[in-house]
Each structure stands twice: as structure tokens, then as C-alpha cells.
Amino acid sequence: MKKVPLTCDVCGSRNYNVPKQSNLTSRLTLKKFCSRCNAHTMHKESK
């Protein structure tokens, strides 16, 4: 497992580092809280 950063779709800040299995090929998307936007927004895996 390796850690990948999650980036907010709205403001683009990297808020979270989450573990991901290396055998998954699709990009991870989660709804998480963004402290810059002060709201729950979609966060996508960035490289």
C-alpha cells in the first residue's frame, strides 16, 4: 500500500494523504471536508 494525496476539486489544495492498494488502477474520489473551502467537497487522487 502506498499513500496518495487527495486534492480538493474546488480550490485545489492537498488536504489528505490516504493509503491505496497498488493493484487498483482507477483514480480514487472521496467526499471529504476541505478546511480552505469550509465545506464538504469532492477530493480526487493526485500524483
From Swiss-Prot:
Keyword Transferase included in the entry's annotation: no
Coiled-coil ranges per UniProt: none
Assigned GO CC terms: cytoplasm; ribonucleoprotein complex; ribosome
GO molecular function, one term: structural constituent of ribosome
A biological process from GO: translation
PROSITE patterns on file: RIBOSOMAL_L33
A Pfam family this chain is assigned to: Ribosomal_L33
Keywords recorded for this protein, A-Z: Ribonucleoprotein, Ribosomal protein
NCBIfam families: PRK00504.1, rpmG_bact
Family per similarity comment: Belongs to the bacterial ribosomal protein bL33 family.
HAMAP family tied to this protein: Ribosomal_bL33 (MF_00294)
Name listed for the protein in its UniProt record: Large ribosomal subunit protein bL33
High-level lineage: Bacteria, Bacillati, Bacillota, Bacilli, Bacillales
